[in-house]
From Swiss-Prot:
Organism, as annotated: Caenorhabditis elegans
Domain SH2: 477-574
Function: Carries out a dual function: signal transduction and activation of transcription. Activated STAT proteins play a role in repression of dauer formation. Neuronal expression is held in check by negative signals through the TGF-beta pathway that target the daf-3 transcription factor.
Tissues in which the protein is found: Expressed in adult and larval pharynx, head ganglia, tail ganglia, ventral nerve cord and body muscles.
This protein's name: Signal transducer and activator of transcription 1
Cited InterPro entries: p53-like_TF_DNA-bd_sf, SH2, SH2_dom_sf, STAT, STAT_linker, STAT_TF_alpha, STAT_TF_coiled-coil, STAT_TF_DNA-bd
Gene: sta-1
Length: 706
């Protein structure tokens, strides 16, 4: 059923489980009847011996006839039993293959896609139905756990049945035991993988953690309350520690390496580093970390001054180039009838994160993790290389989503905004543009005459909008991404005098007011005030600057035709009231900061206010479905073993004599002519390798289709 849908595979697996149930009942019944027949044959054998000893030859002949008929019946019964044993092996094998295909789809496709969407959501990509999708995935995990456990029980019961059965010299029972053992081992392997992969980070921590700041995250076990797992894990602690990303990658190669890493590797300290697994009303078995804090991080030390070993120096990373991960783990636990050596050792990793100790590191840390979230695979396969260059189209999607997420703005970047941004990154008048490298995007100066990169410039604008200009941006009062020359031309083409707000491209995190005024002869002259930074706007808000600037008093419109007074009314309560204030309790009278634009005499005010003269450049005033029974409902230690009473019925260990001798020559002839393993009964016992690394190597994530 390769290529079958998930629903088709689920139906097929459910049908196989039901068939295995019926076949188990038939095997149990047939073996019981066969044991009874052997018992009767043994009794008749003893009767014949006794009659022969008593010289009652006429009775011996009659009993031998009865024994011959009984031997024929027993041989036919054994043939039927052997066929049913073969049938259940085939069905268990089919069920295991169906479970393998379903598990591959579930973990390698559905859960993988969910995790990838979760990763992209951290840079603003929409993922509104994340809870619904995860609940649907949990239902599939629970279904697979139930089906696996049922198949496993039928296989274990059959093994116990065969070991109790009379052992004939044909070797068929031993061959069947070998196949059932292989099936059981594969089912256990699938179950271990299913449980371990069901432990996920349902709420990722922030991509950039700050020391001495709390972080919020949540882990969840998607296996839910199946297999009696609740009684093992509810109120069990989930621990968390921070490890280097290099160590996280090592775990993708060596699944067991986490034991050493979690016990010995320490790169930081987390307070409140454990929480209890609890089951909520929605059936989620989860642990929420709401009060954990990263109190210390051990950054790699920079190379010593004058270090001559360039290779060593090059391997050293700045603090903002180092990635980490949170490792979550549960104390190993045992479940059901599995051996003590087969404990569930469950752990999971967060997405890579950055750590900062100071606000000045935020810009560099944000871009490193942004690039990873957008373009890297969620698989920590050490054989895959990092994406170092992408097309502008992919970069534009990333910027648009990150902008909305970071600023919280309702108004997204428009196509014209992105076109303006592309001019900062692409070579002018070149048709065949090369991919944009991370270095060009985040490290290289935006222009030769500027000391900052494109990302530093864009990041500072996002900070400015978030902290000071969000209302201006959302209402469309801030044009923002437009060049000084284009702003001047646009304003001069308006029928009436106007002003606009644009972001400086020669200074980081600054907004400039551009305006056009008319001379007495009707000539329009554009002016651009020196840009205001966040620090400037802390001293006097942008709305107050616009309201108090003499040169803007007679300009009624913001470009293109927005009533200035309508805009200012939005800020009257929070700005003008704050500036006006009331009487001071100390007796002082309050003062007011007023912004004045120095237009160098090129503009004669139409009002009686005096002209303002000064420097050549205007400047701001301030500084810058299942069976009726479910194996998952039974949790005894010997849930896979038969009762003693049933075992006694099906066991012939105390039977004396050779079984083949009891069955007679007719049995041998029948068995010789019957081959339960001919070409019509061959079945495939080759299973998909569900190792973690192999699962993840099926996918190489691309942020956007090429």
């Amino acid at each position: 059923m390769m290529g079958s849908s998930s629903q088709e595979l689920q139906t097929a697996l459910t049908d196989v489980s039901k068939t295995c149930h019926h076949l188990w009942e038939e095997n149990k019944d047939l073996q019981g009847r066969f044991v009874n027949e052997l018992g009767e044959l043994q009794r008749l054998q003893m009767v014949i011996a006794q009659l022969e000893q008593q010289q009652r030859l006429e009775n011996v002949f009659t009993v031998k006839q009865q024994m011959t008929e009984l031997q024929k019946r027993a041989a036919t019964l054994y043939e039927h039993l052997t066929q049913k044993r073969n049938d259940i092996v085939i069905k268990l094998n089919d069920g295991t293959n169906f479970a393998t295909m379903l598990q591959t789809q579930l973990i390698g496709e559905k859960l993988f896609s969910w995790k990838n969407a979760q990763k992209l959501a951290q840079i603003g990509m929409p993922f509104d139905n994340r809870e619904q999708l995860l609940d649907e995935i949990q239902i599939e995990f629970e279904f697979l756990a139930d089906q696996n456990w049922q198949l496993n029980m039928f296989s274990c019961w059959m093994l116990d049945l065969l070991r109790r059965a009379p052992q004939l010299n044909d070797g068929l029972a031993q061959a069947t035991i070998g196949k059932l053992t292989a099936i059981t081992e594969q089912l256990n392997k699938l179950l271990f993988m299913l449980v371990s992969q069901s432990f996920i980070v349902s709420v990722q921590p922030e991509p950039v953690l700050k020391t001495q700041h709390k972080f919020v995250t949540e882990v969840r076990l998607l296996i839910g309350d199946k297999l009696g797992i609740r009684q093992h894990l509810v109120n069990t602690n989930v621990s968390v520690k921070i490890i280097a990303e290099d160590e996280a990658k090592q775990l993708s190669v060596d699944y067991d390496a986490h034991k050493e890493i979690r016990n010995n590797k320490t790169v930081g300290t987390i307070s409140n580093d454990f929480e209890k697994l609890t089951m909520n009303e929605r059936g989620h078995l989860a642990a929420k970390f709401n009060n954990s804090k990263l109190t210390r991080i051990a950054h790699r030390k920079p190379p010593p001054k004058g270090a001559s070993d360039l290779k060593c120096a090059a391997s050293m990373q700045a603090a903002t180039d180092q990635k980490y991960a949170l490792l979550f783990f549960i104390t190993p636990f045992q479940m059901g009838n599995l051996s003590k050596e087969e404990q569930f050792d469950v752990w999971t990793l967060s997405l890579p994160i950055m750590v900062t100790v100071h606000g000045s590191q935020d810009c560099d840390a944000q871009v490193a993790i942004l690039w990873h979230r957008a373009f890297a695979s969620i698989s920590r396969n050490p054989n895959t290389t990092d994406v170092t260059a992408v097309t502008w189209d992919n970069l534009a999607i990333m910027l648009r989503n990150k902008f909305s997420l970071f600023t919280g703005a309702r108004r997204p970047l428009s196509d014209s905004d992105l076109a303006y941004l592309s001019e900062k990154m692409l070579m002018p008048n070149v048709a065949d543009q090369k991919p944009i490298t991370f270095h060009r995007f985040a490290k290289q100066a935006m222009r030769d005459d500027l000391p900052f990169s494109f990302w530093e410039w864009f990041f500072s604008i996002m900070q400015l909008i978030k902290q000071k200009l969000l209302k201006f941006w959302d209402e469309g009062w801030c044009i923002g991404f437009i060049s000084k020359n284009d702003a001047s031309q646009s304003m001069m083409m308006c029928q009436h005098s106007s002003f606009l707000l644009r972001f400086s491209d020669s200074q980081t995190g600054a907004v400039s007011i551009g305006f056009v005024c008319e001379e007495a002869d009707g000539q329009k002259i554009p002016f651009h005030l020196a840009p205001f930074t966040i620090k400037d706007l802390d001293q006097l808000s942008l709305a107050s600057r616009i309201a108090s600037c003499p040169q803007l008093k007679d300009i009624r419109y913001m470009y293109p035709a927005i009533d200035k007074e309508e805009m200012l009314r939005f800020f009257e309560s929070e700005e003008r009231h704050r500036v006006g204030g009331g009487d001071s309790p100390t007796g002082y009278i309050q003062s007011e900061i007023v912004m004045v634009a120095k237009t160098n005499g090129n503009f004669r005010r139409m009002s009686n206010a005096p002209s303002m003269f000064g420097a050549d450049s205007p400047s701001p005033l301030s500084v810058q479905s299942k069976l009726d029974w479910s194996p998952g409902e039974v949790h005894q230690n010997h849930m896979m073993e038969m009762s003693d009473e049933l075992g006694q019925i099906l066991t012939v260990s105390d039977m004396s004599g050779d079984v083949e001798t009891l069955l007679g020559p007719a049995f041998k002839n029948n068995i010789t002519n019957y081959n339960p393993h001919d070409g019509n009964h061959q079945h495939n016992l080759h299973f998909v390798d569900m190792s973690q690394q192999g699962m993840m190597q099926q996918h190489h994530n691309q942020f956007y289709p090429s």
